[in-house]
């Protein structure tokens, strides 16, 4: 189960890397509001840092729930938080649009750079155009 969640996160990260564009340069899909994407992304970051793995899992859309569990989310985040330390504050944030090449599905992502006690973490929280949580990525920097 952990491997499936890691694959989902790796696929999401690959989408960013394969897009060939600067992450901050892509407009959100039509109908998506940057403020809403950021607000929802901040809620997920707060839940992740508060240890509410079940709530994060329950917000994932059905296809993402098939490859994740509260335990895989917990394991994923604890590994990163051990390196970065406790959350301190948000440093920078923006919303960007992306597209899954294989399916053509457009989605919006909240990108939040946050300071922690030891290191910073860049959070990417992806939402469908219906504002369903598609996936998360947390990269220690």
Predicted regions and their residues:
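Short solvent-exposed beta->alpha transition segments
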Residues: 54-105
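Short hydrophobic/aromatic segments of transmembrane alpha-helices and their interfaces
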Residues: 38, 56, 115-117
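Hydrophobic membrane-targeting alpha-helices
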Residues: 16-20, 24, 80
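Short, low-complexity N-terminal intrinsically disordered segments enriched in polar/charged residues
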Residues: 21-50
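Internal amphipathic alpha-helical segments of the cytochrome P450 catalytic fold
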Residues: 18, 53-54, 133
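Sec-dependent bacterial lipoprotein signal peptides
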Residues: 1-19
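Exposed beta-sheet edge and beta->alpha loop/turn motif
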Residues: 94-141
């Amino acid at each position: 189960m952990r491997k499936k969640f890691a694959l989902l996160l790796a696929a999401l990260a690959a989408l960013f890397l394969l897009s060939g564009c600067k992450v901050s340069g892509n407009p959100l899909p039509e109908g998506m509001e940057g403020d809403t994407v950021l607000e929802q992304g901040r809620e997920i970051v707060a839940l992740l840092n508060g240890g509410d793995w079940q709530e994060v899992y329950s917000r994932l859309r059905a296809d993402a729930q098939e490859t994740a569990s509260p335990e895989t989310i917990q394991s994923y985040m604890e590994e990163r938080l051990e390196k970065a330390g406790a959350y301190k504050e948000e440093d920078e944030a923006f919303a960007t649009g992306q597209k899954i090449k294989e399916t053509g599905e457009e989605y919006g992502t909240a990108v939040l750079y946050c300071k922690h006690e030891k290191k910073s973490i860049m959070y990417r929280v992806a939402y469908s155009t219906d504002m369903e949580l598609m996936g998360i990525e947390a990269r220690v920097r």
